[in-house]
């Protein structure tokens, strides 16, 4: 076990404190230092409560966003849920439902899907990954099979991925 904090940290289980929040950030900072020094290939984190993390001049939304800030590239990280035969990644995370449509773009879909494709090839040894892209809107009816976001953002992004040689298919109705 690596020590990220030199001093003793008083932790009251289930109670967020400024002290435990500071220790969580020190642990993430240590992980980022070790990352920059190529000391590991994969980072697995424990939950971090955004309620007790206070960083001057920075609004802490979560550890994934903090890591992206440390790395300096919002499109360089991707949370992946991994099962035996299925991997799931999200274009948006911790985004209120009312803001999701405005949070997706062709660029975010292309960059995050490309990152997933590279990861599937490199880390999971999948020779030719096939990626299903879900629709944002539910299927409406036979005359109107997709919404504005599918027509203007998701389908053009899938076409751009195809131009890059990435097998991305969809959009699949998210409600079926």
At which residue positions do the language-model features occur?
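Anion-binding alpha/beta catalytic cores of soluble intermediary-metabolism enzymes, centered on
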Residues: 1-176
């Amino acid at each position: 076990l690596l020590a990220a904090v030199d001093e003793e940290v008083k932790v009251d289980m289930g109670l967020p404190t400024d002290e435990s929040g500071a220790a969580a950030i020190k642990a993430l900072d240590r992980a980022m230092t070790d990352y920059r020094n190529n000391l590991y290939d994969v980072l697995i984190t424990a939950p971090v409560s955004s309620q007790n993390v206070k960083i001057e001049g920075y609004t802490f939304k979560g550890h994934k966003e903090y890591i992206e800030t440390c790395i300096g590239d919002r499109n360089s990280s991707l949370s992946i849920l991994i099962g035996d035969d299925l991997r799931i990644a999200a274009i948006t995370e911790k985004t209120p439902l009312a803001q999701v449509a405005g949070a997706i773009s062709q660029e975010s879909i292309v960059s995050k899907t490309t990152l997933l494709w590279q990861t599937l090839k490199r880390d999971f040894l999948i020779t030719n990954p096939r990626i299903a892209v879900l629709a944002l809107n539910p299927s409406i009816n036979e005359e109107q099979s997709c919404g504005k976001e599918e027509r203007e953002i998701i389908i053009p992004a899938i076409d751009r991925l195809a131009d890059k040689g990435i097998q991305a298919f969809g959009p699949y109705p998210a409600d079926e």
